[in-house]
Curated annotation (Swiss-Prot):
Species per Swiss-Prot/TrEMBL record: Staphylococcus haemolyticus (strain JCSC1435)
Disulfide bond annotation, renumbered to this chain: none
Protein name: Pantothenate synthetase
GO cellular component terms, semicolon-separated: cytosol
Catalytic site positions: 38 (proton donor)
Alphabetic keyword roster: ATP-binding, Cytoplasm, Ligase, Nucleotide-binding, Pantothenate biosynthesis
Pathway stated in the Swiss-Prot or TrEMBL entry: Cofactor biosynthesis; (R)-pantothenate biosynthesis; (R)-pantothenate from (R)-pantoate and beta-alanine: step 1/1
Similarity section: Belongs to the pantothenate synthetase family.
Transmembrane helix found in the keyword field: no
Enzyme superclass (EC): ligase
Note in the entry: The reaction proceeds by a bi uni uni bi ping pong mechanism.
NCBIfam families, A to Z: cyt_tran_rel (TIGR00125), panC (TIGR00018)
Gene Ontology biological-process entries: pantothenate biosynthetic process
Amino acid sequence: MTKVIQTVSEMQQITQELKSTGKTIGFVPTMGALHEGHLSMMRRSVEENDITVISVFVNPLQFGPNEDFDAYPRQIDQDVALVEAINVDYVFHPAVEEMYPNELSVTLKVGRLAEVLEGAQRPGHFDGVVTVLNKLFNIVSPNKAYFGKKDAQQLAIVEKMVEDFNHPIQIVGIDIVREEDGLARSSRNVYLTDDERQEAVHLSKSLEIAQTLYKQGERRSHIIVGEIKTYLSEHTSGHIDEVAIYSYPDLEVATEIQGQIFISLAVKFSKARLIDNIILGSE
C-alpha cells in the first residue's frame, strides 16, 4: 500500500528510521502528471532499492513569470493509483507552504552549465530546480536518485550539484521513453492539438537524421544543425526555439564534434514547448 506523506517532518522521520535499519532508499522527484517516462524510473528504483520514495511537487521556483505554473497539470489521485500499481512505497506530496513556509533567505545559483540551452531560454529555471532538489535530498536522504535523460542538461547539473555539495547519493540517468511513433513522453504533450501531435513526431525523426550523419562521419556541427533545422521547418508548424550541439556533460560549445556530444532541440507549438535530445559518442 503506497502511503502519501504531506509534511516534511513526517517524511524525514520515516526515511531516518528506514536508514537506521539499513534499508536502501531510491528517490524519483517529479512534478506529477505522471507518464511512462516517470514510471520507468520508478520501476528501476523498485528493482534496485529496498524502499522507493517519489515526490509530487509542482515547484514554483522553477517557473518563470510567463510560464505555466498555474496551468501545469495536477492529478494526484491518478498519480498515486499509477505508482501503487508498481509498488512505490511513499509519495511525498507537500503543499507549497510546507516546502516554503517563509521566503527563502538562501537559494542556490547554477553557474556556467545553466547559461546555455534551457537555462538560457528560461533564466532562473535551474536555480529553482537545484534549490528544491537540495531540500528534497535533505528530506528524503536517498541512496540513489533517478532522472530522465530527456532533460539531459538537468541531469548534468544535478550530477554536478551532488558532487559539489557532497551529497552521498548516486544519480542514475534513465533513457528517454518514447511513444510508438518516437515522440518523447512528456507531461506537456497533452497541450498539443491533434495536428501538432502529428507534427511532433518529427522532433525525434530530425535527431535520427543527425545520428545518421554522425555515423557517416560528419563532424561539423553547423552542417548537422542546419539539416535538423531544415527538416523541422519543412515538417512542423512550430517555432524552432533552438537546435544546438554541446560537449556532454560539460556543455561546452562544440563546433567540431569530438568525444561525447549532446544534440538538443526545442520546438514551441501553440501551447507546448517540447524538447528532445540525443547523446552521441558514448558507444
